[in-house]
Amino acid sequence: MKHCLLLITAILLAHVANAQKKFERETRIKSAKVAEKARTYVESLFPDSKKIKWYLEENLEGVTIEAKLKENRSIYSIEFDTLGTLHDIERTQKFDQLPMEVQGNVTAYLKKRYKSFKIKKIQIQWTGDPDVLHALIRKGDTDNTFTTNYEIVYTGREDKDTASYESLFDRHGKHIETKEIIERNLNHLLY
């Protein structure tokens, strides 16, 4: 009985530790391999875009399909499940473009948690009904029936250890979650 309890505890701890990690591997795919529902949605969102790139993304939670494109000097990422159901829409953002409240709360969180940090990438993330998000991106309609978060990728140093992290903050800059990014080990050189 004692050994069984120890085994269950070890499994639960491993699961909790795994939940705080992030690993992604993206593979470029042809648009013909993407669910028509996803292709149609992205094409209606960005009808003038000629360079939509599709990716199969494998992560610790499963597999998703992602469309990436550049529009009006921003990079958009639209994520779907393999059947074409929308997960979220993300757009790159500069730190000084964030609302002042968000800038202050994010900076306070990072300064409190790390001795030093460097922000690598910021994305504004929208989730909600696909039609509402379509109106938001195409027309700028904001009826606030969607969720806005900020996804921030950065390096942070704690004591002597430096690692890469991805944190999610709500629309006010309140911390939601942080995952340590698992770097991909390669047995060959990248040029």
Predicted regions and their residues:
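Short, solvent-exposed mixed-charge patches
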Residues: L189-Y191
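Long, charged/polar, surface-exposed segments that mediate recognition or autoinhibition
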Residues: T82-Q125
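Long, low-complexity acidic/proline-rich regions
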Residues: G128-V132, I182, L186
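Exposed beta-strand-loop-beta-strand "reactive/processing" segments of non-cytosolic proteins
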Residues: P47-E79, A135-L168
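Start-of-domain marker
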Residues: K21-I65
